[in-house]
A protein has these predicted regions:
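Catalytic adenosine-cofactor/nucleotide-binding cores of aminoacyl-tRNA synthetases and other
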Residues: 450-452
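Small-residue-rich helix-loop
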Residues: 455-460, 468
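Structured beta->alpha junctions
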Residues: 21, 76-78, 456
Length: 476
């Protein structure tokens, strides 16, 4: 094994895998691979392992993919359980082949996810800018455009993972465990991968098909982009809120592109000359790389900070490089593109849920990762509720159901926590998410009541009826 293993001294039992996952196009292949890593593997075949574990234990596990890197993290209460999570993640990372149904269902999940994000104006603007920018320094949409995502195949996944999801590209930063124990845990995940052959084909490049609506408009909105080195990004973003008060059309990218640069954008031509003159006079200071993944648990952020300190980047900047510099000395003429129109994408769902079945598997065995978990398994341990769902709590009152657009919340009372613990371990409970019928779902307890929620759901009444039927059947 030639994976890079780094042990960091900190009290938490935590680990994070990092590996390159460049966005080669607008398909979101790195995003799809991220979903598939958690979905299934030869050691952990059940599609709901992740959901059951994070709902019933104090473990934390998630991932995030940017334009050039993917991060997979885990945090547990004991070293034994952290090593189990590492084995689970590593096995998923090394898995290359998937059933067509798994790929199509995760595509559907991502389409629901992208539709969920598309409700936010800032996301729409960013997507329009990226889709309309065809310069060599342009960002590729690592989350994917729905109409491009659909083209990805099992062969593309195999080719992509064989190129990037390999040991010599992989690093793990961990605390609370020993290096040799990590090697042992990962070797378990390698048993069925020893004879993996190299996939010699490159993943196909998929880009949006240009249509008349994309390129022609009565009044196309221009976008002017000035590109700066990544070391100035933190300085620009610190000043951005103040700048935007004066210039509402100003937009600053929060990620780096494949060349390690970021863009300062100006949308439209209103007062463009004045803005250009003003921008050239602003000053910035070179700094270290920005903190990564600030939404991750603090223990994971500490591990990632250790990763940065292990790079070859110079730590001591000279006083000259630390001095404030006018932006005019750092930029060339702006690149000019246009806001693209975003196509309307219909989410095609072929899966259905049987609402009449009397065998809803509420007594099914727990998934593999729960069987092997050494810590406590209890419904209330993993209680979690996102802010978007908590907003529905104020409106549900004495009602059993609250629906707002693609968000929903169901209240169950009374039902025992022991019974709910059993239900949440079943594949039947997670069927709407696993089959790609919504973006995400979850369950939590509050003041003695049980709540089940869903988000990014284009057919909320169907999935609500299914969950209600499932819970009702378990009480007879």
């Amino acid at each position: 094994m030639i994976m890079n293993i780094h042990i960091v001294e900190q009290p938490e039992f935590a680990a994070v895998f990092t590996l390159p996952s460049p966005a080669r196009d607008h398909s979101g292949i790195g995003h799809l691979v991220e979903h598939l890593v958690f979905r299934t593997s030869h050691l952990f075949p059940e599609r709901h392992n992740l959901f059951a574990l994070t709902s019933l234990t104090q473990c934390k596990m998630n991932a995030s993919t940017t334009g050039d890197t993917s991060y997979y993290f885990a945090q547990a209460q004991t070293s034994e359980d952290l090593l189990l999570l590492i084995e689970y993640l590593y096995t998923g990372l090394m898995t290359r082949t998937y059933k067509e149904s798994d790929i199509e269902q995760e595509k559907s999940v991502i389409q629901h996810e992208l539709a969920f994000y598309a409700k936010h104006p800032a996301y729409q603007t960013q997507s329009q800018i990226w889709r309309g920018d065809h310069h060599s320094c342009a960002y590729q949409h690592w989350g994917g455009f729905p109409d491009v995502l659909t083209h990805l195949t099992a062969n593309d996944i195999d080719a992509y993972k064989s190129q990037y999801y390999v040991d010599h590209q992989l690093s793990i930063f961990a605390s609370g465990i020993l290096k040799e124990d990590i090697v042992t845990a990962c070797n378990k995940g390698r048993l069925n991968h020893a004879k993996l052959s190299n996939h010699h084909n490159q993943p196909k490049i998929y880009q949006p098909k240009l249509t008349t609506n994309d390129t022609e408009d009565d009044m196309p909105v221009p976008v002017f982009s000035w590109w700066l080195a990544g070391k100035y990004q933190a300085s620009v973003l610190r000043q951005f809120p103040k700048w935007q008060i004066q210039w509402p059309e100003l937009y600053v990218e929060e990620e780096l592109n494949h060349q390690g640069m970021f863009a300062i954008r100006y949308v439209g031509e209103k007062e463009l000359s004045q803005f250009s003159t003003w921008l050239a006079c602003q000053t910035v200071i070179a700094g270290s790389e920005m903190t990564k993944m600030t939404k991750f648990p603090e223990s994971i952020q500490a591990l990632l900070s250790s990763e940065i300190s292990n790079t070859s980047q110079p730590r001591n900047l000279s006083s000259k490089s630390n001095a404030a510099m006018p932006i005019s000395q750092l930029i060339d003429e702006p690149c000019i593109s246009h806001l693209a129109r975003l196509p309307i994408t219909n989410i095609h769902t072929t899966q259905t849920l049987d609402l009449t079945s009397t065998t809803l598997a509420t007594a099914a065995e727990p998934p593999t990762i729960i069987k092997r978990f050494t810590g406590a398994i209890a419904f209330e341990l993993g209680s979690y509720q996102p802010k978007t769902i908590m907003q529905l709590l104020a409106d549900i009152g004495d009602k059993e159901i609250c629906i707002k657009a693609d968000l929903w919340l169901i209240k169950f009372t009374p039902i025992s926590l022991e019974k709910m613990t059993a239900i949440v371990q079943t594949s039947a409970f997670w069927a709407p998410r696993v089959r790609g019928l919504l973006y995400t779902m979850g369950v939590f307890e509050l003041a003695g009541d049980i709540y089940v929620w869903g988000a990014g759901d284009i057919q909320p009444t169907t999935n609500i009826s299914y969950i209600q039927a499932l819970i009702d059947s378990s009480q007879h």
